[in-house]
From Swiss-Prot:
<dbReference type="GO" id="GO:0046872">
    <property type="term" value="F:metal ion binding"/>
</dbReference>
<comment type="function">
    <text>Component of the ubiquinol-cytochrome c reductase complex (complex III or cytochrome b-c1 complex) that is part of the mitochondrial respiratory chain. The b-c1 complex mediates electron transfer from ubiquinol to cytochrome c. Contributes to the generation of a proton gradient across the mitochondrial membrane that is then used for ATP synthesis.</text>
</comment>
<feature type="transmembrane region" description="Helical">
    <location>
        <begin position="178"/>
        <end position="198"/>
    </location>
</feature>
<dbReference type="Pfam" id="PF00033">
    <property type="entry name" value="Cytochrome_B"/>
</dbReference>
<feature type="binding site" description="axial binding residue">
    <location>
        <position position="83"/>
    </location>
    <ligand>
        <name>heme b b562</name>
    </ligand>
</feature>
<dbReference type="GO" id="GO:0005743">
    <property type="term" value="C:mitochondrial inner membrane"/>
</dbReference>
<feature type="binding site" description="axial binding residue">
    <location>
        <position position="182"/>
    </location>
    <ligand>
        <name>heme b b562</name>
    </ligand>
</feature>
<feature type="binding site" description="axial binding residue">
    <location>
        <position position="196"/>
    </location>
    <ligand>
        <name>heme b b566</name>
    </ligand>
</feature>
<keyword id="KW-0812">Transmembrane</keyword>
<keyword id="KW-0496">Mitochondrion</keyword>
<feature type="binding site" description="axial binding residue">
    <location>
        <position position="97"/>
    </location>
    <ligand>
        <name>heme b b566</name>
    </ligand>
</feature>
<dbReference type="InterPro" id="IPR048260">
    <property type="entry name" value="Cytochrome_b_C_euk/bac"/>
</dbReference>
<feature type="transmembrane region" description="Helical">
    <location>
        <begin position="77"/>
        <end position="98"/>
    </location>
</feature>
<feature type="transmembrane region" description="Helical">
    <location>
        <begin position="113"/>
        <end position="133"/>
    </location>
</feature>
<feature type="binding site">
    <location>
        <position position="201"/>
    </location>
    <ligand>
        <name>a ubiquinone</name>
    </ligand>
</feature>
<dbReference type="InterPro" id="IPR005797">
    <property type="entry name" value="Cyt_b/b6_N"/>
</dbReference>
<keyword id="KW-0813">Transport</keyword>
């Protein structure tokens, strides 16, 4: 008699995805972030669901309802901070997952990569709308500033912004629709994740060497299930340390002040995971130019398969490309730091230089170095 997991229509899908899946024998801990992102998504959906049971999306009561969750709901403070800091863990895993893909050339799986970029954009949109919901000062002004950027679009800009706002400013209608979108998007993300996995399982996983590993595959279970469980335990440990010891470490104190349209905070800035893009936006003195640079800073990821000039897939055996990759990482850290600084000398010029370097490395330096390394192979 054949095992039920191999014959049952539903179990068969799970079996081929998580149990009998042939996986390369040499994938490192950098391949753990896919499962960690899955866990992050589950944590966010569950905590979000329980928060939504007590939250009210009305400008008069939104701030109070969040306070009520933290003070009066059983373990409400825990749920709220797990959700807020869970988003930070989500983005840490996302950035590491994307960085892994860039380093080891995983972007040559065209469909998987492009759906991944769409997923990144969807998660960023969800996080932005979630940040607006507590209706604190930074929520309100963040929503005002970021939605206002759409007014830079020629001809339809102003109409588009007012349509998104549902009025002539960020108000009750905006908050209500942001709550609705923030609730539905994670489920759309879940569906996209399934498509992401579908395309990944068409080709199989990449591995650190970037070489075809068909001749040396091992079953996913028990080897990588155990490895993933270790990663998940470490993720939960880090999340709970953050939640229980310093829940407001990554937040903004301004968001503990209720939203006031008559009082602008001295420094409007988004959550830490958007600061690199915010720095690129601010580094261009023109509104439309800044918005284009902001969008391109993420969409440029879609160009990686086209810009790949090397004869080798992975950077494992390409020291010059490795060097440039880590300079790019350092540049992103610099942009993140600049995004949180006020708009004054010397931060303006540092931000502009870091933004230029970001695009130059990706569009020019990495492809050129790859071609040079191809020449070195012939020596």
């Amino acid at each position: 008699m054949t095992n039920i997991r191999k014959t049952h229509p539903l179990m068969k899908i799970i079996n081929h995805s998580f149990i009998d899946l042939p996986a390369p024998s040499n994938i490192s801990a950098w391949w753990n972030f896919g499962s960690l992102l899955g866990i992050c998504l589950i944590i966010q959906i569950l905590t979000g669901l329980f928060l939504a049971m007590h939250y009210t999306s009305d400008t008069m009561t939104a701030f109070s309802s969040v306070t009520h969750i933290c003070r009066d709901v059983n373990y409400g403070w825990l749920i709220r901070y797990m959700h807020a800091n869970g988003a930070s863990m989500f983005f840490i895993c996302l950035f590491l997952h994307v960085g892994r893909g860039l380093y080891y050339g995983s972007y040559t799986y065209f469909e998987t990569w492009n759906i991944g970029v769409i997923l990144l954009l969807a998660v960023m949109a969800t996080a932005f709308m979630g940040y607006v919901l507590p209706w604190g000062q930074m929520s309100f002004w963040g929503a005002t500033v970021i939605t206002n950027l759409l007014s830079a679009i020629p001809y339809i800009g102003t109409t588009l912004v007012e349509w998104i706002w549902g009025g002539f400013s960020v108000d009750k209608a905006t908050l209500t629709r942001f709550f609705a979108f923030h609730f539905i998007l994670p489920f759309i993300i879940t569906a996209l994740v399934m498509v992401h996995l579908l395309f990944l399982h068409e080709t199989g996983s990449n591995n650190p060497s970037g070489l075809i590993s068909d001749s040396d595959k091992i079953p996913f279970h028990p080897y990588y299930t155990i490895k993933d469980i270790l990663g998940i335990l470490l993720l939960i440990l880090m999340l709970m340390i953050l939640v229980l010891f310093s829940p407001d470490l990554l937040g903004d104190p301004d968001n503990y002040t209720p939203a006031n349209p008559l009082n602008t905070p001295p420094h409007i800035k988004p959550e830490w995971y958007f600061l690199f893009a915010y720095a690129i936006l601010r580094s261009i003195p023109n509104k439309l130019g800044g918005v284009l640079a902001l969008v391109l800073s993420i969409l440029i990821l879609m160009l990686f398969p086209i810009l790949h000039m090397s004869k080798q897939r992975s950077m494992m055996f390409r020291p010059l490309s490795q060097c440039m990759f880590w300079i790019l990482v350092a540049d992103l850290f610099t942009l993140t730091w600049i995004g949180g600084q006020p708009v004054e000398y010397p931060f303006i010029i540092i931000g502009q230089l870091a933004s230029i370097l970001y695009f130059t490395i990706i569009l020019l330096i990495l492809p050129t170095i790859s071609l040079f390394e191809n020449k070195l192979l012939k020596w």
